[in-house]
Amino acid sequence: MSGKVLTSIFDASVQLSSLQRYSMTKLVNPESVLEHQGSVAMMGVMLGIKLNSFGEDFDIGMIALKSSLHDIDEIGTGDIPRPTKYAKDSITQDLNNLAKESVLDIFDSIGIEDAYDIWDTSKAGRNGKIVGLCDGLAVLCKVWQETCLFGNKVIIGHAGPVQEMLEKKFSDVIAECKTEEGTVFIASLMVEANLIIESINSDKA
């Protein structure tokens, strides 16, 4: 670790920026894992601040930390397509083990071993639910961008699974809200997200 902290950080950044998401789908504007993490972090901080304006008490700093590290394991595993990742329990377990080893190696090379717990619980707990929701919203954003802005109909098939996934993630955040205003706000976002998905599906023809 001595004398190589910056190069280790640079290496992690470069590798994440080189990893492309949606490897089984042709994109007009390809997205890297680093770009995705940045989107999730920005959305998480913005939603956290907005929710706190209604009297909620989400930890904005922790949301930023969790979201900024949540996919760093893909340096070791790559962006694995869901059909492959979940084809068998044994494959899923092997990939999970590889992810953990990769993250430990990365953080050890920088000397921030304590950050492992932040990554490992990135979508757990109250603040992690915000990260999980924004992870899903970042996918919706990409599908919307490709379909509605660039006319790429190839990615439309992602809309259905995204809608199902977001329903659960919105519900998870609603369950963590302590104020009526926060609950109503998240519910309004769910309605807005469904309208966006409808606009995506309308481009099928």
Label each residue range with its predicted role:
Residues 28-63:
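Alpha-helical phosphate/pyrophosphate-handling elements in metalloenzyme active cores
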Residues 4-7, 27-34, 121-128:
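Short, solvent-exposed segments of well-ordered alpha helices
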Residues 85-105, 152-174:
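Divalent-cation-assisted or electrostatically stabilized phosphate/pyrophosphate-binding catalytic cores
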Residues 27-37, 88-97:
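Active-site metal-coordination segments of metallo-dependent hydrolases
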Residues 48, 52, 75-83, 107-116:
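Membrane-helix exit/interface motif
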Residues 12-36:
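Active-site flanking loop/helix segments enriched in acidic
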Residues 64, 107-157:
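Histidine/acidic-rich helix-loop-helix segments that form or flank divalent-metal centers
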Residues 42-48, 60-80, 132, 136:
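Active-site alpha-helical segments that house and flank conserved acidic catalytic motifs
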